[in-house]
Amino acid sequence: MSPWQFTLFRIVFGSYLAVHFLHLAPWAGELFGKDGVLPDPTLNPTHGLFPNPLDLPLSDGMLTALVVFLAVVSLLLAAGRWRKPAAVVLWFGWTALFHRNNLIANPSLPYVGLLLVLTLLVPGGEPWSRGPRNADWAMPKWVFRTAWILMAAGYTFSGITKLPSESWTDGTAMKFLLDNPLARPGWMRDLMLSLPDGLLKLLTWGTLAAELLFLPLALWSRTRPWIWLTLVLMHLGIIAVVDFADLSLGMLMIHLFTFDPAWLRPRPSRPILIRFDGDCLMCSRTIRFVAEEDRAKLIRFRPLDVEGDRAPDSMLVESGDRTLDRSDGVLAILSTLGGHWRAMAMAGRLIPRPLRDGLYRFIAKRRYRWFGKGDACALPSEALKERLVP
């Protein structure tokens, strides 16, 4: 995992937690209060296993303030401000809420807690974080492997626990899910309900098989990305048809953390040339980032000749005999970086080009006003210096 990949994960994960807590805030008193659904904390099966200050008879206002406070801390985590203390506070709050009301349990809760612990153990100094950059930053291999081992074991264990359930073995679980009051109304649910019962049974058994086989398939490098993707698609499907997205969103966080950038190689595999506005501070920072992330060293840089080439609000990407500009150029750069950046490029191509180009032009016209001016070639980093061409 590269420094920028971890930064991307940190932003998404912190944002997810902030939204989670903000959605929880209006119901904090009802869920965790002395006059709520579980007024006596000793009724929880896990009571006494965790030193929980929420066992005190707190007012609804205090509980709401606590949950909002956790949302604010989540934003600090996303912004890279005091990441490690924020992770400790969030882990404690996350655990305390569960032990105050075990009825909120769902399979993603322990994985979110795991990610908070791992986020605490990852060294500091990643991009967009408080404090100096660590040029030698690296994700500890044991952290990445721990996440993979526990995720794979959890999925297979989940499949094993489903085997005694008649609805999973006879294939009717999917139909029960779609008929459940929590099913999300809409065309997707209606479409799935219109499918033959035999196909719904195959979907049920396929889901069960994917969970059971996750651990053994994760042990083999060739099948690992495919079983990872299968469960990602399963969770996206659950979000589409079940009106309880929090379970799957939490699991998607562990999938984001365990994504291996080596699965998506740079494309194209031949070098490309980026011609950029050297007076634009945003452009300067962007090419420094690209040079840092270009592990395959496929990208070269040259400042635009504004008078001879193109108006300064454009960036050109030369790939073979093609010259790309605007959003097509950005997507070509992301594809060349490979990994999660290539995945973002694949998603970006699903957006109609006029919309992509419109957003590009909107930012380009305001880049000097928003970001100022700066010379990318004045003090280039080592990664950039060797890529600049006259």
Where are these regions (language model features)?
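Thiol/selenol-based redox catalytic cores and closely related redox-interacting motifs
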Residues: 305-390
